[in-house]
Each structure stands twice: as structure tokens, then as C-alpha cells.
Amino acid sequence: MAPRKPRILHISEPRQVRALRTPLRQDILQAMSLLEAASVKELATALGRAPASLYYHIHELENAGLVRKRTVRRSGTKAETVYESAAEQIRIDRAKRTKGFVDALTDLHKATLSQATREVTAALHARSGGDAPDNSLMLVRLSARLSGADVKAARRMLDELAAFISEHDRVGNREAFSFTAAIAKLP
């Protein structure tokens, strides 16, 4: 049995950030958060994927210390490993500034924003056949002059939105939506 997991894991190594680059790995962590602990087969069912497509990614997340083995249980005649995320929340250490870390973080942001672009594009094209417009689609880009307190308040609101979305995520009983947000201090 794995020891009690911490509430927050602060990622501070480039290899950990690189492990998050693919949307599938982000989806795996989100599903693990929803399921608390799951076998590869259970994760595959939750994600609508073949189990074989997940093993490599779970191994990479485990090697980066973002996922850990919780227990091994019997499933018929086979032993089945049950995994869990390494912490309730995984956060990136924003104070880390080594070149390798910043490069890995840049790649992660590019991959995340590219995935968001693919999701919005797919949503737009899915509605181009004459159906009613998708009133849930929303895109906002703002630049503003903010105080440090304003930025902290905005981050707190985004944290609250992320918590709300995570708490209301239920596999199988609602439509799927994508949310992406970024706050960046402009040079």
C-alpha cells in the first residue's frame, strides 16, 4: 500500500514538465484525479481508449514521479496494478528558472495551446453543418496593467474555476468541454 499522498506536489524538474507535454498524459492525470485510483483497464474505459495505448504514458508519468503504484490486486487470474496520482494537485514551481526548466515549460505551454486550438477548431467544424450555433464556445484574450494583488486575485479565481470544473466532471453523464487559460506577464 502506498503512503498517504500529499495534497500538492510542486514540479521542479524539467523531466517532470516534459512528462506532461502530451494531452493524453494530462488526460490520464485528470482521470486519475476523478477516479482517485485506477488500473490501466479502468483508465482506458474512462478515457475511451484501448488499454495498450496507455501503458507507455503511465510508465513515463510514473518515472517522472507524477503517478505511483497504489496496490496490486487480482483480476481473474492476473495481477493488476492500480495507480494513483502522486498528489491531489500537481503544480509547477513558478520560481524555477534554469534554462532546461524554462525550455521544458515552454514546450508544455506550446503543446497545451496547440491542443486547445485543435479542440476549438473541431468544435467549430462540428457545428458548420447548419446546426444551431454552439453557445458554449467562448474565446477571450485580454492584456491589462495589473497590480501584484490583482494578479493574485485572478490566479485565485482561475484556481476556483479549475476546482469547480474538476468537482463537476462526471464521466458519462454530460457533454465534454475543454477549458484552457493562461496568465503571462508581458515583457
Language model: regions and residue ranges:
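Amphipathic alpha-helical dimerization/coiled-coil segments
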Residues: 84-146
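A short acidic, leucine-rich amphipathic alpha-helix
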Residues: 42-48, 61
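Charged, low-complexity intrinsically disordered regulatory/assembly segments
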Residues: 129-187
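Short, cationic-aromatic polyanion-contact patches
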Residues: 14-24, 39, 70-96
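Pre-recognition alpha-helix immediately N-terminal to the DNA-recognition helix
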Residues: 26-31
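Short coil turns linking two alpha-helices in DNA-binding domains
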Residues: 50-55
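Short, Lys/Arg-enriched N-terminal segment that forms or immediately precedes the first helix
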Residues: 2-18
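Glycine-centered, phosphate/nucleic-acid-interacting loop/turn motifs that mediate DNA/RNA or nucleotide
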Residues: 65
